[in-house]
A protein has these predicted regions:
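Surface polyanion/phosphate-binding segment centered on an Asp-His-Pro turn
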Residues: 135-174, 263-384
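A long, amphipathic alpha-helix that forms part
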Residues: 167-202
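Structured beta-strand-rich core segments of catalytic domains in phosphoester-bond hydrolases
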Residues: 59-154, 271-273
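N-terminal, active-site-proximal structural segment of metallo-dependent hydrolase catalytic domains
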Residues: 1-75, 166-171, 175, 210, ...
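Eukaryotic beta-rich interaction modules
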Residues: 2-6, 26-41, 84-92, 114-118, ...
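Short catalytic/ligand-binding loop motif for oxyanion handling, primarily in non-cytosolic enzymes
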Residues: 29-31, 61-66, 115-116, 154-158, ...
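Active-site beta-strand/loop signature of hydrolases that rely on acidic residues for catalysis
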Residues: 20-26, 41-67, 102, 134, ...
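Active site of divalent-metal-dependent phosphoester/diester hydrolases
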Residues: 80-108, 214-221, 229-266, 275, ...
Length: 384
């Protein structure tokens, strides 16, 4: 099963859909050049048309001098806006090298960034980097929080660099807690926050590497308890079948995405092992954008790349063909002539011409929207 698709591979992303990808990255190098894993990640983001990318275990000490490239810089290269929230364990950053196990991060691309509330987007307050969040705020009061978290894998060794040992040391040194398991602490702290965010009105999407069976163990049960958090395991619910192993050498479903009932899923699947960049399977979830930010007209956007570019002949051709087809189908040239010949008063002529002009503007916008896709991954713009 680990070499098969669970669910149905989504096609080209439709209008009104937000596509979220999630996976355990199993480490990403910080360099821009010669970085095959980063290049593959950008290719996947481009090919799948991702709006949100959730990664855990990026394994970077973000304070190390060699990790000078931020996530926005690493994943920029296309034409869409990029925003990111990334976290790691800051308490041991000065005592280790550029590699640090654990860490979580979220990336957002394109028009959806207009709804991103950066001040409301949070990181793990302990500074351990156990989770990151992005908050979307719509104009109608609807807001959705996306969470990416990593529950540490149990380790019996005391003095090593695993996330479990890092968090154990933090509890002993900073909280004088010598007994609580970091995994229990993760579950308690995240569960408390999820309740608080929900009470504040947030709709929630939770992407986790639970490092335990999400159906039978404590963390998954906490998330889906109908008398408690009441989250929905998105892939299993949508496909009607519980998910199988998510780690390429494992036998259990240890990763998952959970949503609140007011988030509408239009497709959900898990790709085979090896499809993504890490050693866990890649999740692809399509969500109705209106269920994340509410209905209504799009927000005013910052100046960004336009789809219509006259230096690209194939784009101009596609734009012109689409526009001319709509002009013919809706008889706008004939209607313009009728406006002049069929009205006897100036106001009548003006009213009909304005209607024709309004229709032509709509057709021009539609033609531009369909003439090409904006890239959000590694392929830099080139007029060739």
């Amino acid at each position: 099963e680990i070499l098969q698709i669970h669910g149905v591979l989504p096609g080209r992303k439709e209008e009104g859909i937000t596509r979220l990808l999630y996976e355990n990255a199993n480490g990403i190098h910080n360099r821009l050049g010669g970085n095959e894993k980063l290049d593959k990640a950008k290719d996947l983001i481009n090919e799948l048309g991702a709006d949100v990318m959730a990664y855990n275990e990026h394994s970077q000490n973000l304070r190390h001098k060699d990790n000078r490239n931020g996530r926005n810089q690493l994943f920029r290269g296309g034409e869409a806006d990029v925003r990111s929230v990334v976290a790691h364990n800051v308490h041991e950053a000065d005592r280790i090298g550029r590699v640090q196990e654990g860490g979580t991060g979220l990336l957002m691309f394109g028009p959806l960034t207009e709804y991103l509330d950066m001040p409301g987007s949070e990181k793990d307050a302990t500074g351990l980097g156990r989770w990151t969040t992005m908050l979307l705020k719509g104009g109608t009061g609807v807001q959705t929080r996306i969470i990416c978290g990593y529950n540490p894998c149990r380790s019996n060794r005391q003095n090593n660099g695993t996330s479990y040992s890092q968090q154990r040391r933090y509890q002993i040194w900073h909280q004088q807690d010598h007994t609580t398991c970091p995994r229990v602490k993760f579950r308690e702290d995240l569960g408390k926050l999820l309740k608080e965010w929900r009470a504040a009105g947030d709709r929630l999407i939770v992407c986790l590497d639970a490092n335990e069976n999400i159906y039978t163990q404590a963390l998954g049960k906490l998330l889906t308890d109908p008398e408690g958090l009441g989250r929905i395991e998105a892939v299993g619910r949508y496909t009607g079948k519980k998910i199988g192993p998510t780690y390429f050498r494992g036998q259990l479903p240890i990763d998952g995405i959970w949503t609140t009932p007011d988030v509408t899923v239009s497709n959900a699947c898990i790709m085979p092992a090896g499809y993504g960049i890490g050693d866990h399977r890649l999740f692809i979830i399509d969500l109705h954008t209106a269920s994340l930010v509410g209905p209504g007209p799009p927000r005013e956007r910052r100046a960004a790349s336009r789809r219509l570019n006259t230096r690209l002949p194939h784009v101009v051709k596609k734009y012109t063909e689409n526009l001319e087809e709509n002009l013919r189908r809706h008889r706008l040239i004939e209607k313009l002539g009728e406006a002049h010949s069929g009205s006897t008063d100036r106001e009548g002529v003006r009213s009909k011409i304005e209607k024709v002009d309004e229709n032509s503007m709509q057709f021009m916008k539609h033609a531009e929207k369909k003439c090409r896709r904006l890239k959000s991954g590694r392929i830099s713009f080139s007029p060739e």
